[in-house]
């Protein structure tokens, strides 16, 4: 008589092991590549505008091209990853395709000789960048113990800020010496690391169970739950909501009275992405306009991403102990205050602190929203929900650089530029508050192991001793 082993429940109840850290470190590395490729446009922008005689409005549109690609990437790759598993296209393969796409096209940007060529490659790179995010989030969420889910997702996405910090730091050293193209050449490193990375990154556990790859599942479960002892009568199963993931349509993210909250997630991401990409693309130029040189302006961008990393990790830690909604709202409030204060004149040290706070708020709140969605949606629609949230919210990312370029073209006093950027933070507080947590996914309270033909509950501590 067979005994069912619910792998999702065992992972939810597991304690942290080296295998968990392997998943989070490798996933964070992917997001570091992602963040670097996205931020380097802001690093190169001052020299690009000078070399190609680009006006602020045109520069804003070029900056939004990659974000437009990210919208398509998130919508396409976020959705098809939940549908293609029955064709043998695993989530890890989708991630690999996205890495190749954004790395190769970013390198090709460095060989561009016209704004048209540059824009085409930035768009294609954006498709890859946008596609990798929902799939890596879904992968990490599958392997994260329940009490660490928010922390794992936000820790992983602190890699975006690390990538931005790396781009800003290297840019402050290399760009004045070698020009802007060197930054795009460095983006080819993921292509070299791809094969070893894919070899050690585990496949989606849900995919492995559905495909009956029992030997691999058994190996992973013994790594994640060392006390688990496999028996020949054990049969690996998933939560009922995970079983038919490949057949999950987009409409499911609107069902069970989730439609309004789904729309509020979209609006919240829209607001945070306006801030993230307006600052990420234009902060060096804004600080140059305020009277700082190129190297120092790039250090301000470095400070923004340092704040983003701290805000992401701290926010994830707090979200697993308190309400993720109010942690996100608190970060947005910090953003509204710090961006408003940037409108005034302060010493460089105070400016660094305020910009770091703005990074914690904008980047941190954006990443908190991704962790929020990972908890809100059931596993069978998680990648779809996150992908569509990122895709629809990308409209804000697209508008952010364009609107900031338009603001600069008006040549308004420095005061108004940052004051305008604080408005999305205020609106974001409202939209996050309106998300209905009563519609959040609740996994069924079942034992990790039960008799397939007997519904009698087996105690959890017995699950690892049979």
Curated annotation (Swiss-Prot):
Highest taxon, organism lineage: Bacteria
Compartments reported by the entry: Cell inner membrane
Periplasmic-side segments: 44-60, 115-119, 172-181, 280-297, 347-348, 409-414
This protein's UniProt keywords: Cell inner membrane, Cell membrane, Membrane, Transmembrane, Transmembrane helix, Transport
Membrane topology recorded in Swiss-Prot or TrEMBL: Multi-pass membrane protein
Transmembrane stretches, start-end: 23-43, 61-81, 94-114, 120-140, 151-171, 182-202, 259-279, 298-318, 326-346, 349-369, 388-408, 415-435
Principal place of residence: membrane
Molecular function, one GO term: carboxylic acid transmembrane transporter activity
Cellular-component GO terms for this entry: plasma membrane
Cytoplasmic topological domain residue ranges: 1-22, 82-93, 141-150, 203-258, 319-325, 370-387, 436-466
InterPro entries attached to this UniProt entry: MFS (IPR011701), MFS_AAHS (IPR004746), MFS_dom (IPR020846), MFS_trans_sf (IPR036259), Sugar_transporter_CS (IPR005829)
Pfam family membership, one: MFS_1
Family: Belongs to the major facilitator superfamily. Aromatic acid:H(+) symporter (AAHS) (TC 2.A.1.15) family.
Known function: Probable uptake of benzoate.
Protein name: Benzoate transport protein
Source organism of this protein record: Acinetobacter baylyi (strain ATCC 33305 / BD413 / ADP1)
């Amino acid at each position: 008589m067979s005994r069912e082993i619910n792998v999702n429940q065992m992972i939810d109840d597991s304690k942290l092991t080296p295998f968990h850290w392997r998943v989070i470190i490798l996933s964070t590395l992917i997001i570091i590549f992602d963040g670097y490729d996205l931020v380097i446009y802001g690093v190169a922008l001052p020299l690009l505008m000078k070399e190609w005689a680009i006006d602020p409005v045109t520069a804003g549109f070029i900056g939004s091209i990659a974000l437009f690609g990210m919208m398509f990437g998130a919508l396409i790759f976020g959705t098809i990853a939940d549908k293609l598993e029955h064709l043998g296209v695993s989530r890890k393969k989708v991630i690999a395709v996205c890495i190749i796409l954004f790395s190769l096209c970013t390198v090709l940007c460095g060989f561009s000789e016209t704004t048209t060529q540059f824009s085409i490659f930035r768009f294609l790179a954006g498709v890859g960048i946008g596609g990798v995010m929902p799939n890596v989030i879904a992968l990490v969420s599958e392997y994260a113990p329940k009490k660490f889910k928010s922390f794992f997702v936000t820790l992983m996405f602190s890699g975006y800020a690390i990538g931005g910090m790396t781009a800003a730091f290297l840019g402050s050293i290399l760009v004045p010496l070698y020009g802007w193209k060197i930054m795009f050449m460095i983006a080819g490193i993921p292509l070299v690391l791809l094969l070893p990375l894919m070899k050690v990154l585990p496949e989606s556990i849900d995919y492995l169970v559905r495909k009956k790859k029992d030997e691999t599942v058994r190996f992973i479960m013994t790594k994640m739950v060392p006390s688990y002892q496999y028996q020949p009568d054990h049969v690996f199963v998933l939560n009922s909501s995970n079983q038919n993931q490949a057949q999950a349509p987009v409409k499911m993210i609107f069902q069970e009275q989730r439609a309004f909250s789904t729309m509020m997630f979209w609006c919240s991401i829209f607001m945070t992405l306006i801030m993230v990409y307006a600052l990420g693309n234009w902060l060096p130029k804004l600080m140059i306009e305020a009277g700082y040189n190129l190297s120092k302006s790039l250090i301000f961008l470095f400070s923004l991403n340092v704040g983003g990393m701290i805000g992401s990790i701290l926010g994830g830690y707090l979200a697993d102990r308190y309400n993720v909604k109010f942690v996100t709202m608190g970060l947005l409030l910090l953003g509204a205050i710090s961006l408003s204060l940037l409108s005034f004149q302060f010493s460089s040290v105070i400016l660094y602190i305020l910009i770091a706070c703005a990074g914690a708020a904008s980047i941190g709140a954006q990443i908190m929203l991704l962790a929020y969605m990972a908890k809100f949606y059931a596993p069978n629609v998680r990648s779809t929900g996150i992908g569509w949230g990122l895709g629809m919210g990308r409209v804000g990312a697209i508008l952010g650089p364009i609107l900031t370029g338009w603001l600069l073209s008006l040549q308004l006093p420095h005061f108004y530029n940052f004051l305008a950027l604080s408005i999305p933070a205020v609106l974001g507080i409202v939209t996050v508050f309106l998300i209905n947590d009563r519609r959040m996914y609740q996994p069924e309270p079942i034992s990790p192991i039960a008799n397939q033909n007997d519904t009698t509950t087996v105690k959890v501590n017995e699950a690892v001793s049979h």
